[in-house]
């Protein structure tokens, strides 16, 4: 007889684990299934783990700011669980959003005011006082180093910054997922690893379980797709699900670089997470007194959509899928060096390359599906790490409401943010929404 659970969650990353945690707290018997060896070992491990409040929509800002409470009180969120690997640490550096043409910062400020986000306005003198290595000239528009105008001397200055003192980053994204797994296990959740899903089984349009690559069948009336870059492949296994979604997901190859801090500047101790739309990058401190430099997907940067199976099997045409490219290394580090006076750029690239699971408008899908009992928390890569605990609770409550008879498509589940007290219309994350043109269509969400 097949093993039976109340809910099977495909994926044990930083969103899959919180969903299990919250469902088990509701009394459901859950099983997370992951093809890798441990929690958080997929795209979560390559996350920059940044915690910031700025998003392009008010609901996005509200959910992100709600999430701050969990990161700032990490041990409390975990129920003071013990983890043999230790606990990830929240690095509360504060978060700088530079006022630039690359960010609609006025809209962000309006959202901050509406939601009640704590922030300060910094003028250029204040920025220079807090981060003396920043050159505050305007370099807009974003260019690539091969552009003949890249090294032109700037003549204008930025307008200032919005500073959010509660922002920062988690010290170890994979460990944070592992911590949540241990918290979920303490409530009764189960996890299996090195287990690849090859079939979503259903009967009369009701999900009944999954089949693993080794032939094992596991049954549950609820299956949740939280498979990260493989999410669209899991949806294709569920009869009618992929085709019915108006918003689809796909995998985007993305590179993040590490660059030494300028000599004499302790960026690890004194630095801030910074979103810099003026140069199309974001950066934060990293161990070894490094700048971790990510791309904000400016228009001049090519986007490479890939098959995740080929990427992880190192079968993409230019060689190893996770190999940094010299072209993008130069683009991100040279841009950052224009902002950071004295930045040291090594000859050999150093960093991380992995995949984002992106929706058509870079806003995630947190929703039910055309198949009864089959749910999705997908399209979340690049900008949802910071929302993971909130997303876990929202998905658990949405699933619970739907299983009790709510027609979520007709009347979207109203999710109340416990700390802010605001109610979110979860139809915002619907699979059947039209593309949201308020989105930044980038990692900024």
State what each model feature region is.
Residues 2-15, 31:
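Beta1/beta-strand and adjacent pyrophosphate-binding region of the FAD-binding site
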Residues 121, 370-445:
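C-terminal lid/capping helical subdomain adjacent to the catalytic/cofactor pocket in oxidative enzymes
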Residues 100-187, 192-193, 199-206:
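Flavin (FAD/FMN) cofactor-binding and adjacent substrate-gating region
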């Amino acid at each position: 007889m097949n093993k039976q659970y109340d809910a099977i969650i495909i994926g044990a990353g930083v969103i899959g684990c919180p969903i299990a945690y919250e469902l088990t707290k509701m009394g459901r018997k859950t099983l997370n299934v992951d093809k890798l060896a441990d929690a958080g070992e997929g795209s979560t491990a390559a996350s920059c783990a940044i915690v910031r409040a700025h998003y392009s929509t008010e609901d996005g800002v509200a959910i992100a700011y709600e999430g701050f409470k969990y990161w700032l009180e990490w041990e409390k969120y975990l129920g003071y669980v013990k983890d043999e690997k230790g606990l990830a640490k929240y690095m509360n550096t504060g978060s700088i959003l530079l006022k630039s043409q690359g960010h609609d910062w006025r809209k962000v400020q309006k959202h901050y005011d509406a939601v009640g986000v704590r922030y300060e306005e910094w003028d250029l003198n204040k920025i220079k006082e807090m981060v003396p290595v920043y050159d505050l000239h305007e370099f807009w528009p974003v260019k690539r180093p091969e552009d003949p105008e890249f090294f032109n001397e700037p003549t204008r200055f930025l307008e200032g910054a919005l500073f959010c003192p509660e922002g920062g980053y988690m010290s170890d994204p994979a460990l944070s997922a592992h911590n949540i797994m241990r918290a979920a296990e303490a409530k009764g959740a189960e996890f299996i690893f090195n287990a690849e899903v090859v079939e979503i089984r259903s009967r009369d349009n009701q999900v009944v379980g999954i089949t693993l690559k080794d032939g094992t069948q596991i049954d549950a009336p609820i299956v949740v797709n939280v498979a990260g870059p493989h999410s669209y492949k899991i949806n294709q296994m569920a009869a009618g699900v992929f085709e019915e979604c108006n918003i689809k997901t796909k995998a985007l190859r993305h590179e993040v670089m590490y660059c030494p801090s300028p000599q004499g500047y302790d960026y690890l101790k004194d630095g801030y997470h910074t979103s810099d739309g003026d140069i199309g990058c974001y950066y934060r401190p990293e161990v070894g007194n490094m700048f971790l430099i990510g791309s904000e997907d400016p228009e001049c940067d090519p986007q490479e959509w890939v098959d995740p199976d080929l990427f992880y099997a190192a079968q993409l045409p230019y060689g190893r899928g996770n190999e940094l490219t010299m072209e993008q290394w130069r683009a991100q580090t040279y841009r950052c060096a224009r902002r950071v006076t004295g930045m040291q750029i090594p000859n050999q690239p150093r960093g991380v390359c992995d995949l984002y699971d992106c929706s058509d408008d870079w806003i995630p899908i947190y929703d039910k599906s055309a198949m009864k009992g089959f749910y999705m928390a997908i399209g979340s890569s690049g900008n949802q790490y910071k929302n993971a605990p909130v997303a876990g609770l929202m998905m658990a409550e949405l699933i619970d409401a739907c299983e009790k008879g709510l027609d979520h498509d007709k009347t979207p589940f109203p999710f109340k943010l416990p700390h802010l007290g605001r109610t979110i219309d979860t139809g915002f994350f619907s699979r059947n929404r039209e593309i949201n043109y308020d989105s930044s269509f980038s990692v900024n969400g």
